[in-house]
Amino acid sequence: MIPYPSFDKIAFEIGPFGSFGPLKVHWYGIMYLVAFAAAWFLARLRAKKPGSTWKPVDVDDFLFFRMLGTILGGRLGYVFFYGMSYWALDPWYPFKITDGGMSFHGGLIGVMVALAIFAVRRKRHIADVFDFAAPLPGSGLCAGRIGNFINGELWGKPTDAPWGFMVNGEGRHATQLYEAALEGVVLFLILWWYTAKPRPRMAPAGLFLIVYSLARTTVEFWRLPDSHLNEASGGYLVGHWFTMGMLLSIPMLLIGATLMFMAYRRRENSGNFSAVPA
């Protein structure tokens, strides 16, 4: 069993600045900066590929919209999917971002809306923009889950496995690291390889939905749910195994499979490349 080192959530402090401060910089905030920086770097690499129809200025605007969608959608998604009981008690709860609470599924919806607006403004096909974005989230998801691990949150079920972490005297699955590996590293490697050459329109976005949903659903079997969602069963929605994460991920799998089927049936050329998909 591995002892959990109990990290300080605050990475460092700056200041004070007169009567203000000091400014406390949290590890989770640093992970968000790492995620956005990685997305910018990877998007630039994609834009420089031979035959790409994307320019650096397109990437900068694209990432601005993506960042807004991630933050706003992630917070609102958490409130709607996981925090309605808190909102009922406190009407200002959605604005209390310092209390924590971000949802991947909410962030995904927010990003889709933001990128759709970007596509309309730039007169690009919405599916092409989604396809361009498909390989980018993996690095950010990995950074975010490492941030969860540093914060000591989102632990999994009790375990006596040698790779478990001893937390408050109890062995626990480090499901944050499982997700960092599957939703982060594995997702990124698969999508980066798949998008190395032109693919049919909608195929990269479809594959992203499939891989993420399978990875998330797998980890949900070891991850503890939010107990306040159904206190009678410890947070499980059905029985003692079906979670909110599964409920939100299964539709992603179905939509992703449908997009892949349609993509290879239609074989429309992607507007992201001037080459013809293989």
Positions of the model-derived regions?
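A feature for loop-to-transmembrane-helix boundaries and adjacent hydrophobic helices
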Residues: 1-278
